[in-house]
Amino acid sequence: MAGRDIVRSLQDLTNLDWNERASSSGTAGTYLKARTGSGSRLIYYKLPRYNGVVIDSYECVNELLASRLMDALGIEHLAYRLIHAKVLIDGAEYETWLNSSRNFRKVGERKLSLGAFFDLYKEPGEFPMEFCRRFGWQEDIARMMLIDYLMANRDRRASNIEVLAAPDGSFRIAPIFDTGFSLLAPLAGDLERITAFDPLADVATTNFVGSRSLEENLRTVAPVEGVKDLDEARIAEPFDGLEGILSDVALLKMREIIQRRWARYEEIRADR
């Protein structure tokens, strides 16, 4: 599977202006963003977590893994590339791994967060999950909850789900994006904690639509329609080409997390 979605040769991206800064729930540090081009040529760049001293590459590797895993599952998503690059931040040069992605909006579409859309169109007493069902998005949300469970994603707040508004007045849920704060990202490369991490731990998540429990959310929507099954080989494929980017210990644990969680999903699905 390794190919055009990983750029190993060092790229000089010191010309990028990292003028967009965002913090993610539960993280220590800032995520820096940049962009080039416009319209169909618009490219977004995203650095992993930066605390003013070091850059942690885990989130960007996770975005690529999630992108590849959703390819295997047949889930619509934003495609990410993983790029080895030199960047300039606050006058200091860093060598790191970062993500790039393209604009997923069609011509004339506007985007707004699901939270903002909910505030505009919700009915009295309506909860986000009920709201999404009313708009016919229940299968989109179910597929999102499946990938969030498999990736142990801790951050699916309202701004990490977008609605796209077309000129004809119709709306659709945007392809899934921002799955980086997942797997081992919160452990910041601590090998002792990585080794000890329970692959089935019900990690708390910030989730606008569901609860703080990823497994509870999955049980609510299982069985998930419109996804392909995984086996050991198809789970291994997304890790192609990642050798040397993260430690072998981390990559093996990440693969174990996805394998064990898919097996748990199969158990949940079989009980329905």
Task: Give residue ranges: language-model regions.
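A broad, structural surface signal
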Residues: L64, R68-A72, E139, R143, ...
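C-terminal catalytic region of ATP-dependent kinase domains
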Residues: L73, D168-R272
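Regulatory N- and C-terminal appendages and interdomain linkers associated
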Residues: M1-R21, N62, R134, G169, ...
